[in-house]
């Protein structure tokens, strides 16, 4: 398969319908996730999106020489080094890539929260913005757990109703 054939395919994802009837897209690859967001922005469907990404951060795969079997057991929320590197990855790469994908490089994610418990760390990022005269809220939740290096990202956009 040539690179051209690979690019012709859409992002690899699965669609799940939640109990409340909401359609949820689930990704296992960061690149596919970003490609999907870019496509939704181009299709004008950007203000009502809910998708999840479950992946190993690039710095973890790099340390394991791109072999998930070689990921150290210490790469989890109990490791200060892992948490520090993950936070840097989220702030400097993931959020930046999301801004680029939805064509909003000036997005700042002012609404930031961090919740820590014994078994997980959760970072929440949120911001209200506007694109093509549509106001919407972007929410990103990043979770790392105590039992592995897999990171869960929950990306959600909701339209904001104008006040009348």
Curated annotation (Swiss-Prot):
Coiled-coil ranges from the UniProt annotation: none
Signal peptide: none
Keywords: Cytoplasm
Induction remark: Up-regulated under carbon limitation and repressed under high glucose.
InterPro entries reported in the protein's UniProt record: RGI1 (IPR022554), RGI1_sf (IPR038235)
Annotated localization: Cytoplasm
Keyword Nucleotide-binding: no
GO biological process, one term: energy reserve metabolic process
Gene Ontology CC: one annotated term: cytoplasm
Pfam families linked to this entry: RGI1
Job description of the protein: Involved in the control of energetic metabolism and significantly contribute to cell fitness, especially under respiratory growth conditions.
Other information: Present with 5530 molecules/cell in log phase SD medium.
Family designation: Belongs to the RGI1 family.
The protein's name: Respiratory growth induced protein 2
Species assigned in the record: Saccharomyces cerevisiae (strain ATCC 204508 / S288c)
